[in-house]
């Protein structure tokens, strides 16, 4: 059901997708959807949470790591870009739906804010700087959503490396520090 909803929301749009269409695409009865989800909003919320929870869990674990902050930040960015590029449907485009601004998606926004805060903490620690670059870092990470939309055959591994390196450049790391961050094994790398 979630796969069918994701495909329809990302291609047809949220408003234009009915629970009947989701049920048909999933090969289930419409009543089955309502047995598990209160409606379309609940389906969309679950899809949105699935794009942010794994990254936040990793970010929380990395926050307490002993590896250099640049290595932990590089690892988080690399994993987050991989998550946003995973699967047959570009779920990141759901972030851009106007409906997502609604109050019913407050849990998603709260988790995304926590992720942005973790990015800020790691970015500040990696640079020993005082300014908050979390929003810029998250913006660079989430830029893969548009790249994936425009380039369906994206070389994900190359993009993961490029974005992770780019984030470290953004926070002021030198080429030597970036090379070290790439080389340091991080215990929670995914």
Where are these regions (language model features)?
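Amphipathic alpha-helical segments used for helix-helix packing
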Residues: 72-75, 83-106, 120, 135-138, ...
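C-terminal peripheral helix-coil segments that are non-catalytic and often amphipathic
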Residues: 116-128, 146-190
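Generic hydrophobic, amphipathic alpha-helix propensity
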Residues: 1-5, 22, 47-55, 119
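Amphipathic alpha-helical interface segments
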Residues: 4, 8, 79, 140-147, ...
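Hydrophobic alpha-helical connector segments
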Residues: 46, 57-86
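Amphipathic alpha-helical packing segments from all-alpha helical-bundle domains
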Residues: 56, 101-139, 157-161, 165
